[in-house]
Amino acid sequence: MIAYTVKVGSDGYESWWLNGQLHRVDGPAVEYSNGGKAWYLNGKYHRVDGPAVECSDGSEFWYLNGKYHREDGPAIESSNGNKYWYLNGR
């Protein structure tokens, strides 16, 4: 079992830390009070099965190992409709 340090802000912001880095294996490492979420592993944005960043405005950002990456669609989907494709950060 992993022993995380969980920090909770007065505004409801929650973050999970391991060895001084944002890190969580079984869910988002950051949950914002506005509903946004961010997944981290070893201090880098990372999520295999969905966007690593989900913003409260509906924008989504897909990362693997800290780099924009998505094989089956745009790695960035902005709430204004803009879309950007990346593989391994390029």
Locations of the language-model features?
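Glycine/tyrosine- and acidic-biased, solvent-exposed loop/turn segments at the edges of beta-strands
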Residues: 1-90
